[in-house]
Amino acid sequence: MAADQTGRIYGTIGGGNLEYQAVKKAMTLAGKDAHFVEDFDLGTGENGGLGMVCGGKVKVLFYSVKSQDPKIASFLKEALKIAEEGKPYWLLLPFSKGYPKIESHLEEGRGHCRILEKYENDETQKIYAEEFNFDGKVYIFGGGHLAQELVPVLSHLGFWCMVMDDREEYTAPNLFPGVQETKTVDFTALSDILKVKKEDYLVVVTRGHRCDADVERFALRTPASYIGVVGSKRKTQYVRDKLLAEGFTNEELDRVHAPIGIDIASETPAEIAISIAAQLIQIRAEKAGLRRKK
């Protein structure tokens, strides 16, 4: 979580009184060379604490950043570049003195969050290390009402989104707050313009079953981790039967989530967007869990 001297924050360490007290502390550190760990007692007992029913103790690492420092500026540029490229990386923050670092690989320790000990300059220092994985792009086929409701939600959840439609008026970026890219395409020639990776998500919300079939035909030939198609059970079955007749197998078609989204009895575009977002959150969490078990 980042906080500035005004109390404005980005991210969270869990909310509640712990976060409130941590932000208050961080506000006093702006512009200072302050790197330290502070213990917070979450209890409600006679010996003090933050009065939180959950109880326990938490260690919070405070690391003051001066944006004018050339080394900090260089670090931030490197982090932004790696994030834009979609590469996994490790963020390393020293417990006391020193600068944050980016590492592409980390052999020491276990888990996606680690406390390491590094020997540098004749002394041993503890380092906090956290893994950041790029979890794929969301390619949305169809720029109608549903896509316009879906993109802002997914963007807020940290998903990278691209919207495609064969109608230029439905690819105007201003229709999709938070979108990274839009493109007017021919749904029958997607393989000429898209290189889908196994970590990517394909969301099919076109205007009709013919376009759905064109996109689904393309999607089934990709390694995408998720393929979802909007529509009634009758429409999705029609497209499935059509693709079976073309030679696709039931096993291949079972990759497709159709109708798309989790079942929350959604009806409006806004409600369906929430059901799709929930399903993508679930898939992303499952993928992250598998990565962390390896």
Identify the residue ranges that each predicted region occupies.
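ADP-ribose/adenylate-binding Rossmann-like module
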Residues: M164, Y201, T206-R207, R217-K242
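Short, structured coil segments at secondary-structure junctions
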Residues: P177-V179, T222-P223
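Short amphipathic alpha-helix with an adjacent loop that forms part of the alpha/beta core around
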Residues: T188-K198
